[in-house]
UniProtKB/Swiss-Prot annotation:
Its EC number is 4.2.1.24. The gene is hemB. Signal peptide: none annotated. This is Delta-aminolevulinic acid dehydratase. The active site is at residues 195, 247. Its cofactor is Zn(2+). It catalyses: 2 5-aminolevulinate = porphobilinogen + 2 H2O + H(+).
Amino acid sequence: MTDLIQRPRRLRKSPALRAMFEETTLSLNDLVLPIFVEEEIDDYKAVEAMPGVMRIPEKHLAREIERIANAGIRSVMTFGISHHTDETGSDAWREDGLVARMSRICKQTVPEMIVMSDTCFCEYTSHGHCGVLCEHGVDNDATLENLGKQAVVAAAAGADFIAPSAAMDGQVQAIRQALDAAGFKDTAIMSYSTKFASSFYGPFREAAGSALKGDRKSYQMNPMNRREAIRESLLDEAQGADCLMVKPAGAYLDIVRELRERTELPIGAYQVSGEYAMIKFAALAGAIDEEKVVLESLGSIKRAGADLIFSYFALDLAEKKILR
């Protein structure tokens, strides 16, 4: 076999060569850190299903945002754990409610931090669903009105992005119209545009304190559907989304790849709680090298076409200076 013309190994034979020809690179600019903030508590609460993740007491949020910024993280996604739930999740659109307070604290503490406000109701409703319940399930159009109100409150508090995750038909259009009518024409929308009804969300329910009984299959997407997944994102683009998202990320890289070929908008991909937990528990068992697997998994998401990755590993990677 001495007559080989093509020898790809020539470009892999040293670390310098491998670095020179590396096609996909990761940096902290690629990452958004999701954070959980609980009101009316004094102490941090560990999320047992997500080793290393804590619920942050609201009273310590300013300190945590400073820590996050000092580590080099430039963006966070805020999730609130409310102690004031009701049938509609009305605390989420109160001007002095938890949604508003989280954005206000983050922006007042670190003005340059890009704050994305998760816009949903599952942490604010007594039933744990993502909107207003009616006899047939979640009332889509009644929920749209409330999403608009929540979005305006978050924007007024300083949120840079409204991030609707309720999976309601028409939510991007309703939010865009509400923001524009209230004078927030420059507040952007990061839409959870392709959000699957995934079993990988399991640990998140503990982290966010969800009261859900049942499932969300009537409004979140069937994991088996590829064409519908692309359609959902393209609908949100047509309604005025500034960025699109695929959630979860790891098991849906085919969707990220195809969406990248169908849109010019930035794409986010959410490495969800179950993906995080699998890596963490496998590493704790000594089955894998955590750092190497984290970087490989994040690299695969970016390689598939994601511009931003939402990951619970972001702060650890930043503080250990694994990424810069």
